[in-house]
Each structure stands twice: as structure tokens, then as C-alpha cells.
Amino acid sequence: WTMGHMVNKKYQVDEFADLGANAIEFDVTFDSNYKADYTYHKVPCDCGRTCGRYEVFTEFLSYVKNETTPGHPSFREKLVLLQLDLKMSYLSESQSNEAGKDMAKKFLNYYWNRGSNAGRAYILLSIPSISNYLFLTGFKQQLKTEGYEQYLDKVGVDFSGNEDLDSIVNVLGRLEDEHVWQSDGITNCWTRGISRLQDAIKKRDEDESRYGIKKVYTWTVDYYSSIRYYLRLGVDGVMTNFPNRVEYVLKEKEFSGSLRMATMDDNPWEKYVG
């Protein structure tokens, strides 16, 4: 999976898809009532990028629905995953729960269209901290309450705050969620050690728990040499500002025989067996 990073404007969806991204990551902020309001990343952000661009969240969601709905004139077949970077670390457990319920309602109304001509992409909810875990509970509860439990097949979770992996695994067990990604990374302005990333990959490969890690990705990776390095480590995904560079590297002899871009036929909630 190649996740285009900080895709917070409508036109950037097309821009990053044209560069080869099969997934986009966008930021989501919340208002004082814990409702998703904008696709916005404040200053600072990645080096070489312009911070502060945004759309109204529901308008953005409707736009990407069209981009991921077969038969729509704007449909992009290769765009198969939407990742939400949820800016909610300051919310309490109960507030996180309410935010999750609101998010589910917005997806039902503006993306899944309550079952009529719905967007088909997989959804990855990147939650900043395990202290916000009730966001996922609220999200699931709302879908079940409204009778749309089937959409849970499309939704996965990622705790993105570089927290202790054992603590994350414990929370995942309580959540009883099988659709688990694990991230590790830092802004492209800095470098980061790989010990935690290697530990996440090891847990993915060795932990047979039903609620264990299924995919591991790293962020934000922009240099060709770094992309090669992380692919050799065994990541499933790379978040980048330059999806075309990942696409280029995947075509190189070293990787072309064993790795390729994921498609809609690839289940993001299952471990890859190469």
C-alpha cells in the first residue's frame, strides 16, 4: 500500500492518485462538540509541504466517495484505501466515544450513502493514542444501532502515536478487532531508529492472535534509498509525499518479482504471505 500523505484538498486526491497512490491519508479535526469538521493539518507539517490547506470534512468525504464508486465519471479503480489521521489526542474517553459515533454517521450519510451507490474503498481509522480507543467502540456501536453492521468489514484500526506495542496489543484484545494495522514513523524532517518498527514486524509475523497486527507501515518516507530500505525490512505500506517514487522502486528488479501495488482484490485485514 502506498499512502499519499496529507491529502487534505479535493484536488490533491487526483494529484496523488495520478502519482500512483493506491491509498490517501487525510487529517480530520473535531469541533467543540466532538464532531468531525475539517481536513486540516496545522503548522508544523512535513518539510516541503504547505500546511493549513483544508476542506469541510463532509464535502471532502463526498468527493472521495465519487472517486471510489464504480460507474461514477470520477471513479479511480486503483484508489482502494482511505486513511483518516484523527486529530483527537486531547479528547477524553467519553468524548472519543461520541466522536466515533459522529464519524460513523458521517460515513453513512456522505460515503456509504446508506447502501445506495456507496464508495467501495477500505477505511483505516488512525487513532492517535490508546487513550482514545473508545472512538472505535463508538463508531462500531453507531453502525450496529443504525443497522449497517456490514460496513464493519470495510473498517480497520491503527494506533498511530508510536506508543508501547505491548500496550497497544492489550487494547486491541479488549476491542476484539481483527482489522489491525500498526504504524511507526516520524515527519520527513527527521530521522528515526528502526527498533520499534522491527518489533512491530516481528509481532505481525509471529503473533497468531486473532486480534493481532495484520499490516505494518511506516511514515513519512520520501527518498528512493529509504523506500528500498523499508521494503527490505518487510513493511506492508509506505506513507509518502511522492507515491511515484514508491511505484518506481517496486518496478526495480530487486522487488518486482515479489512485491506489487495492492488492489481491491487484496484484503488489507489479512497477513501477506509472499
Swiss-Prot record:
Disulfide bonds join 45-51, 47-189. It holds the Pfam family GDPD. It is an enzyme of class 4 (lyase). One of its GO terms (molecular function) is toxin activity. Glycans are attached at residue 66. Belongs to the arthropod phospholipase D family. Class II subfamily. This is Dermonecrotic toxin LspiSicTox-betaIII1 B.
